[in-house]
């Protein structure tokens, strides 16, 4: 039976604290990777964003129209952010980044490299639960693994106090490491749906705020099933 939680946020917090404690920017969780951005690459990215916004107004308009068709999913996505304006800007920045880089496959390859005979199946905008709150980004689903990367560098807590360092939050799991993927719903707010992943060594991850929840959940389960079938052959 899939879990149904009266207060999913309590469950998210307890799970995150149990398995993703930070120690000065380093994480006990072997699937979490922290990548510090370089000022040069950030400047190039900003320059490219401005260039695309200036040259590709039509593409941005087309993308906006498509987004409006998913208004329900977008509302569910944006409400997980403490700032709707920040979430909207993150989505615009991510969409522009995809145009600049030539699509999600190239972004995936640049951020995570490529494994042998790996093929990207799909990617979805979502949030991941962390001890610091929901982090917006994109989850990439390939035939070999799932990978998440935050849209922008976030401030990570420091054991010495202070503001900590700004870094990209990434999660990478190969399919053979994943034990289960399930769906859960906040019974007090049925529109809030979550994807719960558990690894074979007991680590848990919660993803939420999908613009296309059903498509994402089905894609994840199909990829997990195909991976198990391939390993059984």
Swiss-Prot record:
- What PANTHER family does its record include? GEM-LIKE PROTEIN 2 (PTHR31969)
Q: Where is this region: Disordered?
A: 1-45
Q: What is this protein called?
A: GEM-like protein 2
Q: Which Pfam families match?
A: GRAM
Q: Which intervals hold domain GRAM?
A: 106-185
The record lists the organism as Arabidopsis thaliana (Mouse-ear cress)
Cystine connections: none
Family to which this protein belongs: Belongs to the GEM family.
InterPro entries, alphabetized: GEM-like (IPR037848), GRAM (IPR004182), PH-like_dom_sf (IPR011993)
- In what ranges is there compositional bias, type Basic and acidic residues? 1-16
In terms of domain of life, where is this protein from?
A: Eukaryota
């Amino acid at each position: 039976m899939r879990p149904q939680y009266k207060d999913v946020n309590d469950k998210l917090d307890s799970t995150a604290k149990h398995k993703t404690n930070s120690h000065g920017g380093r994480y006990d969780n072997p699937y979490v990777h922290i990548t510090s951005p370089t000022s040069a690459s950030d400047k190039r990215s900003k320059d490219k964003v401005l260039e695309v916004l200036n040259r590709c107004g039509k593409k941005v308009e087309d993308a906006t129209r498509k987004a409006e068709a998913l208004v329900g999913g977008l509302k569910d996505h944006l409400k997980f952010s403490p700032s709707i304006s920040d979430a909207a800007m993150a989505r615009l920045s991510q969409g522009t980044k995809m145009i600049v880089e030539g699509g999600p496959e190239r972004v995936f390859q640049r951020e995570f490299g490529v494994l042998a005979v790996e093929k990207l199946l799909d990617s979805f905008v979502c949030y991941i639960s962390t001890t610091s709150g929901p982090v917006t980004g994109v989850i990439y689903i390939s035939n070999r693994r799932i990978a998440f990367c935050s849209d922008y560098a976030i401030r990570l807590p420091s054991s010495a106090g202070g503001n900590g360092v700004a870094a990209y939050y990434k999660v990478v799991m190969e399919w053979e490491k994943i034990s289960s993927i399930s769906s859960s719903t906040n019974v007090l707010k049925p529109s809030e749906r979550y994807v719960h992943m558990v690894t074979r060594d007991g680590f848990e991850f919660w993803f939420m705020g999908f613009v296309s929840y059903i498509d994402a959940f089905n894609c994840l389960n199909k990829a997990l099933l195909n991976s198990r079938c391939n390993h059984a052959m």
